[in-house]
Amino acid sequence: MAKRDLDKSASRFLNALWRISAGLEQQRQRILDRAANAPRLLPDSQFPVIDLTGDPGNDLDYYIYELARLQDIGKAIIKVFGQPQELVDAQARFEAGIPNLRVIRNPLTHPNDNDELDEVAWFSSAVKLKPGGSVEELVDPRYEQHEVAIAYHLALATYLRARISVCDRRSSTQAD
């Protein structure tokens, strides 16, 4: 059985993480720009409302997809590199910080004839509308959840870069 080249694995994962991070940042910026430029309803009230009528929410959907890709690649990295505790802990923080990611992502990716998205509304975040007018946050790219995602990405990338550095140092030492 061939031995896995962990240096190549780390490089592949870093490339994928770079694309995921770029996607998260691009979609987040589009969401923020759209909200900043949307018409204001009740502009003189304490809580001015922005009018996102007609926006299909694609940028938010793509942001959610990228979050799920980050979650999936994190699990793969953890598995390939033998469950490093620092990454297991980072994964736990990610999942605690965005607990409803799969609640929204799975029906977005695999639509079918059920009610999973019937009470979901897309604004600058995806929320589930509750009785009495309250909402349950599913994914919000504007604030803490984005910071949680970026922290997870950083933990994964830092671990992988250190892994490559160790391999590179070992190779250069052996060559001497």
Walk through the language-model features, giving the residues of each.
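Histidine-centered, metal-coordinating catalytic motifs and their short helical/loop contexts
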Residues: 94-119
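Amphipathic alpha-helical interface segments
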Residues: 1-97, 123-176
